[in-house]
Amino acid sequence: EKAVEHMGVPVVILGQKSEKYPCIYHDDEGAACAMMEELLKSGCRRPAYIGVDRRDKAAGENRYRGACHALEKSGLHMDEVPYRVAAFSAQGGYQAMTEMLADGKRPDGVLCATDMIAAGVLSCLSERGITVPGEMKVAGMGHGTIADLLCPRLTTVHYHYHTSGREAADLLLDLMEKRGDSRNRGC
């Protein structure tokens, strides 16, 4: 933040909500809640969540809160379901699912904070002969390029990255030309 302030140029934060700077962000909490609700509606009775470090406000804290909210609405609590924190990678997802399966509390559905984590989960399950979506449903978030390459195809939350990028550019131009408001905008 000090370096940004020292530069003295307009700044727009993209992808994270900021109280200090104008920003364009996605509703990560709402998206995670909706995806966990979909897993539950599809018949999952033993859901799990693989998140990321909660110091990351968007992918960590907000997605965790969304998953918790969906679980609470269905009468569950995060303390009652398998939960792991993983690195932002397929390897992180693989390791987290390996640990969940070793605990003996095998979920029938898992929401992953990112598509890369979900890719690792799918790899782990495939190696162990656990069918997706037959024996376990897997969902990710972000609709990254990897989501369309996986087999089976990944159920994922699609964020409108092009729209948010365009809005961030428009907001930055407005700030540079000193016109328009600098309020935060959700996408």
Task: Annotate each predicted stretch with a short phrase.
Residues E5-C187:
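Bacterial carbohydrate/catabolite-sensing allosteric modules
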Residues E1-K2:
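Central regulatory/effector-binding core of bacterial HTH transcription factors
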